[in-house]
Amino acid sequence: MMQRAPQPIACLLGPTASGKTAAALAFAARAPVEIVSVDSALVYREMDIGTAKPSSEERAVAPHHLIDIVDPVDAYSAADFRADALRLVGEIEARGNVPLLVGGTMLYYKALTQGLNDLPAADPEVRATLDADAAREGWPALHARLAAVDAVTAARLAPNDSQRIQRALEVFMLTGQPMSALLAAPARSDDLAKGYRFVPIALEPSDRSVLHARIAQRFDAMLAKGFIDEVRRLRARGDLHPGLPAMRCVGYRQAWEYLDGETDYDTMRDKGVFATRQLCKRQLTWLRAMPERIVVDCCAGDAAGLALQAIERVIAG
């Protein structure tokens, strides 16, 4: 018996402010689509403005998944995403609808399409120990500690990159092996994704300055919508702190510093825009490492229409 060819699944990927939502909704207007978010910030509840979460009107156009599923105090990993996304794709197809993956968290996409490395799950006790060490010695000291056991990882991290330094030390403490060595090992394979062929459609700028201008405009619009008040409400809960993954999201970290009195308003705004541009740069680096991607110029006048055509070609096989 002939084996069924893998089902093509369109994945609309792109950096911040590249027009992913507009393109996805254009497709949703023409097909029975359900959108699966590929975004590590949209998973968090109570974080709407700073994540540019789709509005209730936009979500009414088509069902959206993996949005508002986690409390900001909790963690959500690439492994969690992979399991959820594969389950959802199967459920959406079983309903007779078309799954469309949309987002910009490239680590999630890599986990989905290439499998997972054999890294341990987060350990609250180890993290608490490292947080205490950092409070006493400072993150540069922990960066030096990391360099002694995993020089490869330490070399690519800034001395104050607390999130990644902590994770790399945590992995070493739990496994006795450098994280760089574990990441270099072949990813664990399974049969869960073998029935699908995930096709990346990349919204990339022909003129990066256009994207930079959009990023600045979007951050200013977030501020005008009440982003600072949103962060104030999160702080008022009392159970959140700047070390949590949710509060390390771009924009939230800068707003938290501002509300702590560490920066003034204009500096916070400029740092937020700069951090978003740096995120965009990293996203584009990931995208350009995908030779199989279909490229759509997000600066084109009809970028949404071009992306729509690409999605329809993928779905048609």
From Swiss-Prot:
Co-factor(s): Mg(2+)
Catalytic activity, as annotated: adenosine(37) in tRNA + dimethylallyl diphosphate = N(6)-dimethylallyladenosine(37) in tRNA + diphosphate
Binding-site positions, substrate: 16-21
HAMAP family, per database record: IPP_trans
GO terms assigned for molecular function: ATP binding; tRNA dimethylallyltransferase activity
Top EC class of this enzyme: transferase
Binding site for ATP: 14-21
The UniProt record lists the keyword Magnesium: yes
Family designation: Belongs to the IPP transferase family.
Protein name: tRNA dimethylallyltransferase
Subunit (UniProt): Monomer.
Presence of the UniProt keyword ATP-binding in the record: yes
